From Swiss-Prot:
This is Secreted RxLR effector protein 120. A motif (RxLR-dEER) lies at residues 48-65. The RxLR-dEER motif acts to carry the protein into the host cell cytoplasm through binding to cell surface phosphatidylinositol-3-phosphate. It comes from Plasmopara viticola (Downy mildew of grapevine). GO terms for cellular component: extracellular region; host cell nucleus. Residues 97-130 are annotated as: Disordered. The gene is RXLR120. The keyword Secreted applies. The lineage of its organism: Eukaryota, Sar, Stramenopiles, Oomycota, Peronosporales. It comes from the Eukaryota. Transmembrane segments: none annotated.
Amino acid sequence: MRGAYYVITALLVVASSQTSADSGHRLHVYDHDVVAAENAAAKTLPQQSLRGSRDVPDDLAHEERAIISELVEEGAKLIPRAAENVEEMPRVTEAVGKRPRVAEKDALEKASGADEASKKPRNTATDDAFQGMSTEWELELPFKEWNTEIEPMREMPEPKWSWEKRKLVHEAFVKLCAEDLNPTVYETARLWSLFDGKAKSRPATFHRQVLIQLAKENVRRDVLIMKSVESEWDRWNEVSILSRVDVLNMLLNVHFQRWKRMYNAFGEQRSKLIAL
């Protein structure tokens, strides 16, 4: 997702600015005169393609600076003050360990209706009204859980339907979703697999865990995209450990919220979609 790539860029600029301010230096941020209106930036961002090259036309470069500047301002409100230095690993690790957080297990237990839902099979077309997944709680993983390679998710069995059937379900699902979700064929298949076959009878906690893992994979891809752009990867490595954790957790929740919204949308219309 290009949007997530720009979130990383913006938050890293913010974190770098804070670190530079702590050391008595000021990091240059793009001139506010080039910042476009918020709604214009929101409309433009999804339509752009990923460009890692420096050979970018002036008008496009100008547009991207505007978008990044807009995100910098938003990021400044969200990300906490950067830790003192990357080299001070023990202090940073200790600080991260003391920060209040919601681990995966705790978050799953506290999610509304999780216990009740886990005691009975998932709703089918003939069961009670679909119980959607709460979007009011978030995850915050500690440093030790981000300090390892995010393992690719085990392949889940996809619905055994023809490509034509998958395309039909995908097109119908896109129309049901809010415009900002825009699910892909792959994402539709992942959600479909939770409401068809053996997975539909698994408890709510299992479904949440699947969505968390899918969100982690999204973060992993975002980092790989950033790594492919040398200047952004260098900037990432200059930022404090604590700030990196904040950025990763913020991205995790951006993706996790999106997956939950898509899950709820599919679940509400599951019988109609699967019957296509």
